[in-house]
Amino acid sequence: MAAKVTDLRSALKMLEDMPGQLIETDVEVEPMAELSGVYRHVGAGGTVMRPTKEGPAMIFNNVKGHPGARVAIGVLASRTRVGALLECDPKDLGKKLYHSVDNPIPPVLTEEAAPCQEVVHKATDPDFDLYKLVPAPTNTPVDAGPYITLGMCYASHPDTGASDVTIHRLCIQGKDELSIFFTPGARHIGAMAERAEELGQRLPISISIGVDPAIEIGSCFEPPTTPMGYDELAVAGALRGEAVRLCKCLTVNECAIANAEYVIEGEVVPNVRVQEDQNSHTGYAMPEFPGYTGPASDQCWMIKVTAVTHRKNPIMQTCIGPSEEHVSMAGIPTEASIYGMVEKAMPGRLQNVYCASPGGGKYMAVLQFKKLTASDEDRQHFWHSLHSVS
């Protein structure tokens, strides 16, 4: 029987025991474009363009400029791997997530020593430097800078205290500065930052990197499935049958995922916006899941970093767009959301949902119906039209 997956390390151990699902290399790689380029050819079957191909996840043990650190990429870039990691038949992943949303297990705060705080670097240290502490790759030569693509951003609403976890676009801008992009009107932490700004306050935030895949998948839910006040860490708790463990941050009034590989602590600064490519001046941000390189934003918020903590010999986890990893993270929660909405409207009719790779997990869904009456045909067409318009 396979060992239980509780964090990134146990997830990688499971993949190691699955033939053809993980490649590890000790060859030195540059984090600037080379690491992602090697993965594209070896792990992504030669391309990350649509239609994407599946290949093994990779671990790079020798990243130039970052002794003792490793980088994992492509962990979720296969529905087969996601199914194994979540102990579910790949075709039933959407249904499993749907039931997890409806049966949440909220996270709990632990008082035990947190693995993510085995090594502590504070911004007040004279040699503190994000560029050196965090082996964040620059995926293409025109990227705005080194990106943290799988950071679990965790913050709490200034008024209600309700917490939320979300993945955001994070770019290293300086020794103790990150830019964060909030899609206008579409993200809970963005709304929290706006409210904190109205109050003239900084918003404490933690960014946990290298976590249980259940957390990464669960964090990709969006409203209305998970409205404001719903902590998506509770989805991961339901998927695992036990609560996600949080620890208190050391330098800000927020919590972080206790068994993460890295945690970046900081505060979102009010009334400050930065140009995303202020250091590279390329005009671009990074490759996005639909298949294009997005333009750099001039409306990114600024995070002032106060600390970086990590495990001993930490593993940085990253992804590159557009890839099957995005299809898994965006698509499977979307399947769950569609399944839930249609099930409420047409109980027992919808058999399954699949968000296919050509749509990047968001723009194409295949719905399997069980038609019991002639009128079901019209209902089916209605849902198809509604989804096409949206």
What feature does the model see in each segment?
Residues M1-M302, T306-S390:
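Extended, highly charged
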